[in-house]
Design a protein with these regions (language model features):
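First exposed extracellular module after export/assembly in secreted or surface-exposed proteins
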Residues: 1-99
Length: 99
């Protein structure tokens, strides 16, 4: 994780993406999908960011932002973002740039 707040309710990580040039930053649409895999017979699939997880105890979300040369995946929670970060670790991220 690139950044984690002291209360662990916010964190993010950045990935260099040299394809996001000044022109892309100013004019393009960028979307991200996270691969969802399962240990049973459930078929794999892709889910688009942002992702929101709500239950009776807590709510967490993950979302995409970008700047010239990088993307940032941010996590927010009313408790700790640790579990959500663990869920995303090791998953394939698909980035779509439409310019």
């Amino acid at each position: 994780m690139t950044y984690l707040s002291d209360d662990e309710q916010y964190g993010n990580f950045e990935i260099p993406v040299p394809e996001i040039t000044e022109d892309v930053y100013s004019n393009a649409l960028i979307s991200a999908y996270i691969q969802r895999t399962y240990d049973d017979d459930t078929p794999e699939r892709w889910s688009q960011l942002p992702q929101v997880f709500i239950n009776s105890d807590s709510s967490t979300s993950a979302y995409l932002s970008f700047g010239e040369g990088f993307i940032r995946i941010s996590f927010q929670s009313n408790e700790s973002v640790g579990n959500l970060f663990d869920r995303f670790s090791g998953r394939v991220l698909k980035l779509i740039i439409v310019n």
